[in-house]
Regions:
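Conserved class I S-adenosyl-L-methionine
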Residues: 2-51, 155
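Class I SAM-dependent methyltransferase SAM/SAH-binding core
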Residues: 57, 63-105
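A short acidic, Gly/Pro-enriched loop at the edge of an enzyme's catalytic core
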Residues: 104-116
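A short glycine-rich, Lys/Arg-flanked "PGG" loop and its adjoining helix->strand segment in the class I
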Residues: 131-143
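Conserved beta-strand signature within the Rossmann-like core of class I S-adenosyl-L-methionine
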Residues: 144-151
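Acceptor-substrate binding/catalytic loop of class I
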Residues: 159-175
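Conserved S-adenosyl-L-methionine
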Residues: 185-196
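Core SAM-dependent methyltransferase catalytic element
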Residues: 196-213
Length: 213
């Protein structure tokens, strides 16, 4: 018999996590709108040759900070979030098309995007669901398209569960690399954030991965 903790139902994970974000949307916006993630933008756009306009999906767009920034660079952005309040705010802030979709019930289409920007979002997917979600992101990209993702990492073993009302999968660096590769992506770049700190103080793992041509 396994002693591993039981993973909650997807309905509970979604309702509690999205409920938290809906209830704290304004506070979240105020606390994150000035975060400098230019390094992450440059990682995605550089991998795509910095050509504009690119068709980009902001997966887990929140209130729209990155939609605004990437649109201002001349790209065509589509946002996606499961939080109704985040979707409302993102549409208002960016003027972009923003899809209200659960990560567990995606409808993205085939080869619809040149790049996917998944900044601090994929870790909300339970480990058992990651292969399916990553496969859908893979299918949504054109051949040669690029996935950028940034997620908190575990320094010892893969773990998952609720942190307050938000569910998270905290994988090791190798855990994230394995999940991305299993979906068919080829990882081309990895780095840790925040920059300029010792590795033990860099909890965020950023990956740039390409869909083969």
């Amino acid at each position: 018999m396994s002693d591993a903790p039981k993973v909650p139902e997807l309905s509970e994970i979604a309702s509690r996590t999205l409920g938290h974000y809906d209830a704290n949307a304004v506070r979240f916006w105020e606390g994150t709108r000035d975060h400098d993630v230019t390094q992450n933008y440059e990682a995605l756009l550089g991998a795509l040759g910095n050509a504009a306009p690119l068709r980009l999906l902001d997966f887990g767009c929140g209130p729209g900070r990155d939609l605004v920034a990437l649109s201002a660079l001349g790209h065509t952005l589509t946002g996606l979030d499961g939080s109704a309040e985040f979707v409302r705010m993102a549409r208002e802030h960016s003027g972009c098309t923003v899809l209200e979709q659960s990560f567990f019930d995606l409808d993205l289409g085939e080869a619809a995007f040149d790049g996917v920007f998944a900044n601090a979002s994929l870790f909300h997917v339970p480990r058992a669901q990651l292969p399916r979600v990553l496969a859908e992101l893979f299918a949504s990209l054109v051949p040669g398209g690029v996935l950028f993702c940034s997620n908190p990492r575990s320094f010892d073993v893969d773990r998952e569960g609720f942190n307050g009302e938000r569910y998270g999968s905290y994988l090791t660096t190798q855990g994230w690399l394995g999940a991305i590769a299993l979906a068919g992506f080829v990882v081309e770049q990895q780095y840790f954030r925040p920059t300029g700190l010792p590795a033990a103080q860099q909890p965020w793992l950023a990956l740039v991965a390409r869909k083969p041509v």
